A protein has these predicted regions:
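Membrane-interfacial loop-to-transmembrane alpha-helix junctions, especially the N-terminal start
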Residues: 5-14, 56-67, 105-113
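Alpha-helical transmembrane segments of polytopic membrane proteins
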Residues: 34-46, 82-92, 136-147
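Membrane-proximal helix-loop-helix units in multi-pass membrane proteins
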Residues: 62-111
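Hydrophobic alpha-helical membrane segments
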Residues: 16, 87-98, 107-131, 139-146, ...
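Cytosolic juxtamembrane helix at the C-terminal end of the final transmembrane segment
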Residues: 3-5, 52-57, 94-109, 148-164
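Internal transmembrane alpha-helix with an interfacial aromatic "cap," most often the third helix
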Residues: 37-65, 92-103
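Juxtamembrane "helix-exit" motif on the non-cytosolic side of transmembrane helices
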Residues: 22-31, 75-79, 123-134
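N-terminal topogenic module of multi-pass integral membrane proteins
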Residues: 1-51
Length: 164
């Protein structure tokens, strides 16, 4: 039996990453620390981007763009301060923007994820660097909503792929 990995496989992994992120967000809202789920979501997203970049038969432009998104994701992990938050907020909109550019009808998902990333980034930066600790609940709530938006986008991409 030979395993065949297609875009549909990797979009499923993106859906799993969004689900892990959502579970972590619900745990944080409940006062628990499930940060390992966020690390799992980060790893799944990174692996997915790498495998999308390495897919046999894809164009050089695809490889370059997916690998570039992987580099931005790594910068979000290795970076410090506000730059890391900004790099983190660029990955999913960048991925969805590229998929939209390739002709996938995901304009609404792209708009929702982009808006959710901007709002979440704003609230996180105000909480961490602006000293507005009272906004931390709203930043965490926006994290859950952002994970839901990412999940919807990943599910849409998954459903658009033909069964292979």
């Amino acid at each position: 039996m030979k395993l065949k990995f297609t875009h549909k496989t990797w979009y499923f992994f993106l859906l799993c990453a969004a689900a892990a992120s959502m579970l972590n967000g619900f745990a944080v809202l409940g006062g628990m620390d499930f940060s390992f789920l966020e690390m799992a979501a980060f790893c799944i997203t990174g692996i997915t981007l790498l495998f999308l970049a390495a897919e046999k038969g894809s164009s050089a432009k695809d490889k370059r763009n997916y690998f570039g998104l992987f580099v931005v994701l790594m910068l979000s992990y290795m970076g410090r301060g506000w730059a890391a938050y900004i790099c983190s907020a660029l990955v999913w909109p960048g991925l969805l923007g590229y998929e939209y550019q390739k002709g996938r009808p995901i304009q609404r998902q792209l708009q929702l994820v982009g808006a959710a990333e901007v709002l979440h980034l704003l609230f996180v930066l105000l909480t961490v660097y602006g000293g507005m600790v009272g906004l931390s609940f709203w930043a965490n709530l926006l994290w859950v909503l952002l994970a839901c938006a990412r999940g919807w986008a990943a599910l849409s991409l998954y459903k658009m792929q033909e069964d292979a």
